[in-house]
Amino acid sequence: MKVHVYTDIETLFGRACRVWMDTLLDAGHDIEFIDLGTNTDAPLPNVGQADVNVLVAGIYALPRFAKHGLPRHGRHVLWMFDPLTKNEASVHRHKASLFDALAPHLHAVMAMDASIERYVAQHFPALAVFWLPYLVAGKHVRAPLLETQRNRGIVMLGGDTPRRREAEKRFLASPSPLNAEFIWSGLWGAARDACRAGSRISLSIHADAEHTYFDQFRAFETWALGTAVVSDHFEGWESFGIEPGLHLAMASPQDMPQVCAELLADVPRREAMVQASQQLLREKFSPAAWQGRMLSMIESVA
């Protein structure tokens, strides 16, 4: 089978693409990777025929597909990591509009969580939907840095929103001095990995309070690099095998400075959290654990 794997942000979704490429190559399929880049206006490249197109698409590829259509050949499967909501008060609402324009032309969706499964079932009941969370290859799960090797305290990597700005103000106003960095943009690839690996705590804060979800990409990549996560509250952690307090600390933004201060002072606890979270990645979220299901998904669509 000939499979094309597309993405738009290689420095963000590149590892997710390689998970698919390695899995399909190991099964004897013919694979080609197409990096669309971040241009939302250019026509799609002419890369020839394929039986299946796996689209690991974000905010650049979705409008490009909506404008120029999907690849001309093959059947189309979208691996959806962005949250979907029609709530007009949420900063995520535009992603649903982009998805809705694309959905009638898809043959299947791989949903990162149950909320996306429900969205597709409600609005596009004829569209096949599978659950496939973000996966991390074992070769990307690194030994954690020693405490003395870490060069950052608390780090938040993500888009700038009013809710996150409020969280930043709370850290700045904390009675105990906390070395917290809120980095809104400009850090990708190896530099992003180094930042996460060198930090003692990585924050995961919802962009808004209207649509909350488990940010797998942020948490799993951070765990793989050996750093503890303090997360905003989210539902559905049980379905991922996550135990708050064991794999991550969970707190509301107003409580995060205190939770982080306590965690910074407790190196053994942070080390235990990293060990538990990396074990969870290896057991539940490695490509090896999902290989059979991944191949079955592709074969059912082809």
Predicted segments with their positions:
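Non-catalytic, usually N-terminal nucleic-acid engagement modules in DNA/RNA processing proteins
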Residues: 75
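Short, contiguous hydrophobic alpha-helices characteristic of membrane insertion segments
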Residues: 228-232, 246-252, 293, 297-302
